[in-house]
Amino acid sequence: MTLEERCHLLVHPLIDLSCRSLYSGGGLPVVELVGTGGIGRPRTSHIEAVDPLTVTDMMEQLQQGYMASVAATAGCTMELVSKDKWGVDAQLIRPPRTALDEETMVLAQLKCTTQTVPDPAKEFFSYQFTKRQYFDHLAKRRGYLKAILIVMTTSPRQREWTEATHSGLVTRRGCYWAYLEGMEVNPDVKKPTVRIPTKNLMDAAALTTILDRADRGESLNG
């Protein structure tokens, strides 16, 4: 089987095709997936770290702090999931207004990368999963509890991640979210690459909108 044959997948607007489209017989477009999967260099090899032995943990801590601040601003809590067994790192919870009401919750998979700088003038930027299972947990059909991907992009220079001024603490750079439920990728693709909309900047207003949609049983994409 050729590479082209093995890399056919169903088209979805958030799948990063990096490809040319091939149409046949009036059916769904067939696409050629380019450059997805395989073994790459370690993702921290290019980082100017304070301590290379801890930088991955520090990237996680940076994103957790960002999201905890966003959740607090939206009147929510962020509860970390201690065991990564089902592709979820955190729960974002809006408490009920009264004891008789229900809380609203979404699950979140947190990813932090230094390898891309989103351009707000462009519609998307790309993110590649390091394992197929991380994608599958987000793409599978779920019942009530929905799950989103939250990707943080930050500087490869660790000492530039934050800067304090008298007006506040600046965090570089930001988090973006994507709702991937229902996506389909060929089983042969081991490290799917997805498109993250640059309009989906994660802040308190975005989190509130996501939780409102979840509360109404709507698609989180609106």
Regions from the PLM with identified roles:
Residues 5-7, 14-86, 92-222:
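Mixed-charge (Asp/Glu-Lys/Arg
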